[in-house]
Amino acid sequence: MTDPSVDEALARRAAQGDQYAFGQLVQRHGRALAQAARSFGVPESDVDDIVQDTFIAAWHALDDFDSDKLFRPWLFRIGLNKMRDLRRFRQVRHFLFGAKDIEDAELTSDVPGPEREVSARLELAKIMQVLNRLDLASREIIILTSFVGMSHPEAAMALGTSAKAVESRVARARAKLTALLQSSQV
């Protein structure tokens, strides 16, 4: 977890044109954004583009950033919007042209590793399959709170809702996920 006060200080400096400060924000949050994108089912070939597009949009919107609020949820809200945009684009393309991407058939890993790592990857792949069966709202809340590690107030800011609503959504999403996992024998 990153220190919010450091993020806000870096964001203020970046808003004044300090590229080094912005680079520090990229280093501090790039990996978590990439993991969130993967968790949302963004194909590996698009993950770096989503992260880059998110940071470009954040750079351009820094003047609108309210330094009284937390930077991380603000950034992840931009990232979620970029992921939704990609999903909509793919849905429209599939509807219009019937195009499916080769990335949809990617393997988790084609490099053999220790048995433990392979087993962990298989388990994660099963969980991700079940997670992808959840509705988008449930998937978003599980990924932000469980995978990214956001608190309920942070997730609320990222999703544009209240912390109480996040608490309810987390409970419902976990119940759905548990039911799917049990029915799938994962």
From Swiss-Prot:
Any one GO biological process: DNA-templated transcription initiation
Similarity comment text for this entry: Belongs to the sigma-70 factor family. ECF subfamily.
Gene3D superfamilies tied to this protein: 1.10.1740.10, Winged helix-like DNA-binding domain superfamily/Winged helix DNA-binding domain
Taxon lineage: Bacteria, Pseudomonadati, Pseudomonadota, Betaproteobacteria, Burkholderiales
Motif (Polymerase core binding): 49-62
InterPro entries to which the protein is assigned, alphabetical: RNA_pol_sigma-70-like (IPR039425), RNA_pol_sigma-70_dom (IPR014284), RNA_pol_sigma70_ECF_CS (IPR000838), RNA_pol_sigma70_r2 (IPR007627), RNA_pol_sigma70_r4_t2 (IPR013249), RNA_pol_sigma_r2 (IPR013325), RNA_pol_sigma_r3/r4-like (IPR013324), WH-like_DNA-bd_sf (IPR036388)
The entry's keywords: Cadmium, Cadmium resistance, Cobalt, DNA-binding, Nickel, Plasmid, Sigma factor, Transcription, Transcription regulation
DNA-binding residue intervals: 152-171
Gene Ontology molecular function: DNA binding; sigma factor activity
Pfam families cross-referenced by the UniProt entry: Sigma70_r2, Sigma70_r4_2
SUPFAM superfamilies linked to this entry: Sigma2 domain of RNA polymerase sigma factors, Sigma3 and sigma4 domains of RNA polymerase sigma factors
Source organism, top-level taxon: Bacteria
Protein name: RNA polymerase sigma factor NccH
Function of the protein: Sigma factors are initiation factors that promote the attachment of RNA polymerase to specific initiation sites and are then released. This sigma factor regulates the genes for a membrane-located efflux system that confers resistance to nickel, cobalt and cadmium.
